[in-house]
Every structure is written in structure tokens, then in C-alpha cells.
Amino acid sequence: VSELLHALLEPGDKVCLEGNNQKQADFLAQALADLDPARVHDLHMVQSVLSLPSHLDVFERGIASKLDFSFSGPQSVRLANLVAEGRIQIGAIHTYLELFGRYFIDLTPRVALVAAQAADRHGNLYTGPNTEDTPVIVEATAFGGGIVIAQVNEIVDTLPRVDIPADWVNFVVQAPKPNHIEPLFTRDPAQISEIQVLMAMMAIKGIYAEYGVNRLNHGIGFDTAAIELLLPTYAESLGLKGKICQHWALNPHPALIPAIESGFVRSVHSFGSELGMEKYIAARGDVFFTGADGSMRSNRAFSQTAGLYACDMFIGSTLQIDLQGNSSTATRDRIAGFGGAPN
């Protein structure tokens, strides 16, 4: 892989490394960070999420110098430090849709490093439940004259379905271990506090019921998980079933299962997936967007579009907010970025 990257990359190239909220092209990310900075340097990284240490190692080692991104949650403190040291020049902090759009305008990757669950002998890719950003990255790169390199967990004779056709992919590399997928941090409802339950009840009665919020996008957090859990109990006691919260842009949160099983929820389109939810998703293809094989195909670009144009409401979080409601996710000590929240 090192020899391949040294042969393909040139100083100043725009490189899209697939760092999603969950799925990470971690093998290729580490290979990129291990390159010789005398041969490959001043890369312009264009990627939605900075999640792994290797995503910033490329700047610390002088392999990359410029960055356009959307979210850096786990690496936000280190990112701020590297910016302060002058090792990273930030082009812009985008929403997901802004960044995806610029992939087709002025930030078209010359090389894309992506992750897939499997490839067949022809090079077709199966991206599975955590498809996330892969389609938009590959399409912009492949049809923009760029080079697509995919790391895969396995190479098989027949795929469950084809998510990315082989003629959009230039190189396939079987990684030594499965790519990293970050679980959602709201997996354990026991961590929901009594205050968050109270806030959820206030939101359901004072906002959802009052405004008839029926199409919505929940950000990931225990505040929203509390609302999801209370739908078939508290919300139903208010006579709200069939009136609110039927159609969702949302990852397949375990906290949503009771609302689905009670018939509160009619449809869910997802940005990503959730480890351990595969069998449940396959069993509820009437609710989730699944393929003929039963597995879900998430799509962050389409879910962000739905969140912006097709939803009544969004709940998210921020680092700072003033009395006028202006907010920021870039502070002196942290540069987290908004992800898709401003949509």
C-alpha cells in the first residue's frame, strides 16, 4: 500500500480520506500517515470527519498542510493545537452538504481512500449498512478524473448487493483486519438522567405536540434518546400516536425500538448504522431502507438533504451559545465543527 500511495500521490494533491462519523478507512489512513514526507507533502485533505489520531498525524508529519472538513469531535482539542502551531491551514469548516457539494465544484479529490465491507473478484464494492459517505466520495472522484482506492474487509465471489460498481474503482486492497466502525455513544439508556427525561417530556408536550412535529431529524445524544424512549409511553398517553414523530432522518438508535414496535414510527432513513442492530433492521424492512439482501444502505448525503428540506424540526447540540441564540463549535481550545447541524 505504501508503494502504491507513493506512486500515485503528488505534492499538493487533494485527497479525500473516508473518515465518517462511524466507518473509517483506518488501514489506508495509517498507510497515508506513514508515508515519506520528503516524497509526499503539502496534501490538501478534504474529508467530512476527523475521528482517528492518524487523521491528524498526516499534518503533524508534514504530509498534509491544508484541511477542509465538517466535524472533528474526538480530535477537536488536538486540531485546535495544530492550527495554533501553524501546522494546519483550514480552508473552511463546512456542513456535510456544503463539503459534499464542493467535491463536485472546486474540492474534487484527485485521490480518494474509501472503505467497504467487501469486494468481488471484479472490483465491485458492497458497502453494507454503514455506507455513509462512500457514494458521494466515489462518484465525485471517479467522474472527476480522480483515482479511487478502496480498503475492504474481504474479497468474495458474490456480493450481497453491488453498492459501488467496479468501473468506478481503480484499486482494491484487502485490509489485515475489519475497518473500524464507531458505535453510537447512546447505546446504553441507563445513562439517561432524570433531568433529560424531564426535558424530553417538556419537548414532547411543549414543542412536538404544539407544532405537530411529524417529520424530524434527531441529533445523537441522550437528550434525544430520552424523547425516543418516551414516545410509546408518555407521548401515547397524551394521545399523540399518529400525530407526531412518524417519519425520521435518524441512525437506527436502539432507543427507537419501543416506538417502532408500538407502531409510533412509520419510516426511518439513516445517515449511518449501529453495530448490533443488523438483525433488527433486516426484520423491519417496512420501516428502514433495506436492500433485497435485508441489510440497510445508509447514505449521509441523502439523509442530510432530507434533514434540510424534508423535516419539520432538528435537535442538536453546540459548544457555545449566546443570549441571542448564536452558537459556535470553534473555541480557543477546541475546533469541533458542526457536522450537519446547521442544515
What are these regions (language model features)?
Residues 1-343:
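Conserved alpha/beta enzyme-core scaffold
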